[in-house]
Amino acid sequence: MKVGIYPGSFDPITNGHIDIIKRASEIYDRVIVSVMQNPNKNPMFTLGERVALIEQIIQPYSNIEVDCFSGLLIDYAREKGAKVIIKGLRAVSDFEYELQMALMNRKLCPEVETVFLMTNSQYSYLSSSLVKEVAKFKGDVSEFVPEIVLQAMSKKS
């Protein structure tokens, strides 16, 4: 069974993330959306809230699950029996950072590969940070996130 892990903070999960998740689910037998606790970020949603939102979004897909982790991603991948880390790329600037991470992960654990999926061009500018910034100033983010996330965000502001 081919297992892929799609890690991220997903704060909030965007339509760009969902596009990558759906496409990965067509390639891998099992996809684990792995929500990480990032101590360097001040999240809009708690870890539990992010997991709950993603669980509702992925409900129609039998081969996608959601989990959370902290620590080294490569250790988590080993623990889950995953041989692939899935990363979405929006721009060249994403590639530079993600390549460094992929090379470090390969050095730490050569049996786990990193696979890059190019973001659909309609989402190439989209990031959770930008969605939060627009929402902070009462801008309309309805085309960037699923309805359930939009509702959850409106309760936070």
Curated annotation (Swiss-Prot):
Stored InterPro entries: Cyt_trans-like, PPAT, Rossmann-like_a/b/a_fold
Pathway where it operates: Cofactor biosynthesis; coenzyme A biosynthesis; CoA from (R)-pantothenate: step 4/5
Residues annotated to bind substrate: 9, 41, 73, 87
Cofactor: Mg(2+)
Keyword terms, alphabetized: ATP-binding, Coenzyme A biosynthesis, Cytoplasm, Magnesium, Nucleotide-binding, Nucleotidyltransferase, Transferase
EC code(s) of this entry: 2.7.7.3
Domain of life according to the entry: Bacteria
Primary subcellular site in the record, as a coarse category: cytoplasm
Residue sites binding ATP per the record: 9-10, 17, 88-90, 98, 123-129
Cell compartment(s), UniProt: Cytoplasm
Enzymatic reactions: (R)-4'-phosphopantetheine + ATP + H(+) = 3'-dephospho-CoA + diphosphate
GO process annotations (BP): coenzyme A biosynthetic process
GO cellular component: cytoplasm
Subunit structure: Homohexamer.
UniProt function note: Reversibly transfers an adenylyl group from ATP to 4'-phosphopantetheine, yielding dephospho-CoA (dPCoA) and pyrophosphate.
Similarity remark: Belongs to the bacterial CoaD family.
Name listed for the protein in its UniProt record: Phosphopantetheine adenylyltransferase
Organism name: Alkaliphilus metalliredigens (strain QYMF)
